[in-house]
Amino acid sequence: MRKTAVPVNAPTLLPMEMKRRTIASLMPHPVNGGQAEDFTIITSAQRGYPGFPGRVGRTREESEPHWESPVRARQGAPNIVIVFMDDMGWADVGCYGSEIATPNIDALAARGIRFSHYTTHPICSPARAALLTGRNAHSVATGWLAQNNPGFPGYFGDIPLDAPTIAETLRAAGYATIAVGKWHNSTDGVRPNPTWPTYRGFDRFYGFLEGETGYFFPARILYNNIVAPIDAYPEGYYATDDWMEKAIGFLTEIRNHDPTRPFFLYVANNAVHGPLQAKEADLAKYVGHYDAGWDAVRAARFQRQMAMGLVPAGTRLAERDPAVPAWDEVPADQQRLFARHMETYAAMLDCADQNLGRLVALLDELGELANTIFVFSSDNGGTNSAGPAGALHFSRRYAALPGLPVELDLEREAWVGTGRGSAVYPTGWAQVSNTPFPSYKTYTGGGGRRVSFIVSWPDKLADCGAIRSQFAHVIDVMPTLLDLADVPVLAESHGKPAKPMQGKSLASVLRDAEAPAPRHEQYYECWANRAYYRDGWVAVSLQKRGEAIDFDNWTLHAHAEDFSESMDLRRQHPQKLAELVEAFDEAAWANMVYPLDNRTPARRFLEGPPHLRPAAESRRRFLPNAQTVHRNVIAPLIANRNFTIVARFRHGAGDRGVLLAIGDVAGGLVLYIENGALRLTYNGFGRFHALAGPAVPEGECSAALEYEALGRRRGRGRLALEGGEVGEWGELSPTLMGGFHEGLDIGLDRRAPVDWELWERHGIFRYRGTIRDVVIESGPFAPDMSFARE
């Protein structure tokens, strides 16, 4: 009941009189000889308008309105664009010594500043978390790949809400915020949750949440928080083009609504991460360009770097990796295959450069190019993950399988660079990407942690085309941009005090070539590989996958005399090494780096919280007419275990099409009806099998695939119709276990096809009849639940 104030010593009033007198108290009413009675006016808050700073009466005339002013950025605030590449080495763009045509990136450097000693966390998710938060990756729970939570604080995989992102900070300052492309900072890609981009400060997001996807057939694109309803991509579709097309569309939308509002655009290209796939027109530019081989191309890049002044005089080119054969020792047929891999890589980077040119042209046309801060960089260096021969079917690694023989890749050479393969280039080309440094992605040597870094702001940075040799790290990007844009750091985030930023602004270095580096030390850790940099010295410890961690195998390098980190000085300076090793240990404890984990890819990639693992025996029913069921839901139901999949449907005369499909070109299975009969194609990550089933009668039907996991990744299956013929057992090896991007489709095979030939005949091959449901019944795991690759 609402309480009403009454005057002191007032007579007792009946309810109606109380109401009358209360109303009267709100208006001038001389009583008692002209003196106003001591009534207390009820405030807006007491009437149910808490926090409203205006006044509310019973009528408009008695009230005072109030309008909240929207947050506006300061007048003249710059636009901010970050173009982030994926798995691109220090030496891959033209302005860092490459032969690849990157005129738009080179122009960015010509009107900006290049850094020669910028470093990163050497793997995807940690580098992105550090970039977006200005904090060390482990300290924001992202010391490893986001989708592989091992259960320790530095590795949970989701950026905590008390670590505000640059998007959240800029939006609070009045910026429009946009992200396109790759996210890879959420553990849960299935359901909308507070780790998705639009929950972490972005007004608009168009892209994918996971670590990689195909370029011709991306899996599960999100438009903000909604799965884009894409069954098939149009002819000529290519993801890198699509990301920029949407970015330009978002920017145009912003300008149509508000011509002056500054924007922050995060272009997170998945190029040049595998699978290496490129458009034919771009591939054609590079045919024959890499026939000279990786030794010659690497030497030429090194010479250009020296001539540019990026690499100091007297620097040694790091020795060739012992795992990389000399090019002239590679058989001629393999040379052609290996060159094709690098042609594809170059074409992909060329395409990304073209799209940067489209963005620059738009900003130039709008008259906003001069007042736009551009940052261009990569998450980490080039990768050696595919080994000396590369891999056409690299997804086998994610499925805990050994690579296929190079002879098979030779037979399928025409697939390299197309949507049919999931290729990654050979280690020799990764060493070219990382010229002049040794080491690769996931390792803390120079090749993994040192990447190109360009900052451009024509309106304010006068030293165009210059090179800065001051040390910098990825966590410095956010504070630098906030400093340049004069945007304050957030004190609170999602109702909590914000974690302090660990990055330092590089603004002084950008404005003055002689300014000291604001940062003089930094730790690095990835997959138990460690490094520590301090005042020109760096200690590095690299590990062998799956072996006991060696805590004493550190090497020591002096940056002033050894830019390429190719000379080990640990014996000459044992005290300096001990100092850096101790500093790493202190930083590791302070940033939640421990425990170190050096398990194999199979063990790490396939681990997850126990509550996400289905029971040993489980049954799931799935309904048609819905979006693709996420692979994280489907894969555990069939991973290296017995299972039965049953599709119930009504079949009419002449009906045909896909009943269900799991997976994509990388691996999976598709059950379909063609020429009146039940058929199955099984894509065992480059090993293909087919089962022919019985003819399908008209009427209500129930078709089943029965699968047995036999151990050592072998399996067999058979097709059956309820009440009808049961097919013969046929080999379906290897067992499926991750490695594909798509989940379960019912009634069609969306986007990337499991069976390429079937797709060429029929496209997505939508079933013409009526499907009731699909049931997956999981059985026991394989007898040994072994990993073929340890």
At which residue positions do the language-model features occur?
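Ser/Thr-rich, low-complexity intrinsically disordered segments
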Residues: 1-19, 28
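Intrinsically disordered, low-complexity regions enriched in serine, threonine, proline
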Residues: 17-18, 44, 57, 610, ...
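Formylglycine-dependent sulfatase
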Residues: 22-550, 554, 563-582, 596, ...
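Short beta-strand motif preference
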Residues: 265, 453-455, 532, 555-557, ...
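Asp-box/BNR beta-propeller loop motif
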Residues: 560-564, 724-726
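Charge-dense polyanion-binding interfaces
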Residues: 581-599
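Extracellular glycan-associated modules
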Residues: 595-790
